[in-house]
């Protein structure tokens, strides 16, 4: 822990990349653990452009359940710690694979949501923004198109603006902190390789050998320990 505190204090450009493990402490299921979404449902049957086109009833049911699961979910201490670090100038950029919007709800600025956001909806046919209640009510767009959340489905490209913005920060980073992701999904899995800076991996399961420092633990709990050490050193 002392090592990351030193690096975080000395770094002039720090980037944080988060995954599903960042959200589990807020009560959301992750995807790849034994109790995660993908153990219950084959992603190839629901989170794809094919499902949107040919099995819309299942697609809508799956995403409606995920949207409704967010109703009482709030950011945890770890989200607020990252916001505080950002405001103090300790970190310069936050990117996330999560679609839940919890970083933004915690007050973080200019978060790049690399896999989109489940908190907004659009028409697949005309691209027009739509109201969430219309999607939940299984309504179609006035043009006749199918409504869908603004998430990146399997088979779709990442939002180019968010990707390019994060990539530029990665290349400039002196320190990259990866939190709560197994780094199994391409191309986000490649981002930590794009930096010449120090790299830190925080996750319940280690599984990553190419990082300069690996810390096994829950995201929020680990961030609270690091934050306490930072505060101790600044007293």
Tell me what each language-model feature is:
Residues 1-235:
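Conserved catalytic core of sirtuin-type NAD+-dependent deacylases
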């Amino acid at each position: 822990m002392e090592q990351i505190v030193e690096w975080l204090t000395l770094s002039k450009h720090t980037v944080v990349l988060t995954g599903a493990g960042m959200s589990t402490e807020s009560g959301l299921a992750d995807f790849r653990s034994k109790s995660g979404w993908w153990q219950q449902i084959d992603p190839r049957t629901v989170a794809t452009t094919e499902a949107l086109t040919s099995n819309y009833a299942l697609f809508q049911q799956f995403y409606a359940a995920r949207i409704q699961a967010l109703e009482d979910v709030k950011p945890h201490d770890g989200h607020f710690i990252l916001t505080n670090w950002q405001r103090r100038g300790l970190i310069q950029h936050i990117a996330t694979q999560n679609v839940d919007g919890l970083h933004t709800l915690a007050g973080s600025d200019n978060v790049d949501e690399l896999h989109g956001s489940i908190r907004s909806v659009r028409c697949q046919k005309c691209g027009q923004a739509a109201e969430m209640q219309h999607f939940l009510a299984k309504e179609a767009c006035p043009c006749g198109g199918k409504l869908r959340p603004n998430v990146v489905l399997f088979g779709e490209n990442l939002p180019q603006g968010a990707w390019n913005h994060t990539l530029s920060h990665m290349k400039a980073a002196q320190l990259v902190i990866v939190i709560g992701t197994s780094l199994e999904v391409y191309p986000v899995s490649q981002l930590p390789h794009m930096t010449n800076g120090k790299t830190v991996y925080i996750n319940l399961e280690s599984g990553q050998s190419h990082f300069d420092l690996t810390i096994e633990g829950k995201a929020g709990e680990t961030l609270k320990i690091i934050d306490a050490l930072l505060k101790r050193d600044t007293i």
